Regions:
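Helix-loop element at the rim of GNAT/NAT acetyltransferase active sites that forms part
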Residues: 43-56
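Conserved acetyl-CoA-binding loop-helix of GNAT-fold acetyltransferases
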Residues: 121, 127-140
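Conserved GNAT acetyl-CoA-binding A-motif
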Residues: 135, 142-156
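Hydrophobic adenine-recognition pocket in adenosine-nucleotide-binding enzymes
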Residues: 33, 119-121
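Acyl-donor-binding surface of acyltransferase catalytic domains
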Residues: 1-21, 93
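Hydrophobic beta-strand residues of extracellular immunoglobulin-like
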Residues: 70-74
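Conserved acyl-donor/pantetheine-binding loop and adjacent beta-alpha core of acyl/acetyltransferases
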Residues: 81, 85-119, 126
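A short beta-loop-alpha structural element at the N-terminal edge
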Residues: 27-41
Length: 161
């Protein structure tokens, strides 16, 4: 009896995940950012992060200009607007440092590592699985591009251990 329950539960979970992936694929396009979407990315950053953490307009646009391939966005097909984004900066360095947030000149196109800079989803789209899909797709894509590591930093207050 317990085995049947476990199998049914797992089957339902798998179907729900499959349905969620299908819904996300229908509603959202996951792709590289376009230059004309820079203003939307800046606005999203300002909505999703407090002022002292948000990337400035200047730095965001500089990153988009220099390393657009390291931006992955979720574009709502119904509205044509960005719902979420994930961005990083490739480098051969192994240690994350704060300068990656503000100096797009540290970008090394053939870098073996990606410093993960930002993951954000607009509040009205949160809870739909967009962030998970962005992370999964970003990791898959960068692995295909030969990256060895994705390196994340987080404020202590946001990652209780």
């Amino acid at each position: 009896m317990k085995r049947e329950y476990t199998e049914i539960r797992e089957s339902v979970k798998n179907n729900m995940e499959k349905n969620q992936r299908e819904i996300l694929a229908e509603r959202f396009e996951f792709r590289q950012i376009l230059p004309q979407e820079a203003d939307q990315a800046v606005e999203m950053e300002q909505i999703c992060f407090p002022p002292h953490e948000a990337c400035t307009e200047e730095h965001m646009k500089d990153r988009i200009e220099k390393a657009p391939s390291l931006f992955l966005v979720a574009m709502d097909r119904e509205t044509g607007k960005l719902a979420g984004l994930f961005t990083g900066l490739s480098t051969n360095e192994d240690t994350f440092r704060d300068e990656f947030f503000v100096d797009a000149d540290l970008y090394e196109p053939e870098g073996k590592n990606v410093m993960m800079l930002s993951l954000e989803v607009l509040p009205e789209y949160q809870g739909m699985g967009i962030a998970r899909k962005l992370v999964e797709e970003y990791c898959r894509r960068e692995k295909e591009n030969g990256r060895e590591q994705l390196i994340l930093t987080c404020l202590d207050a946001k990652a209780e251990m």
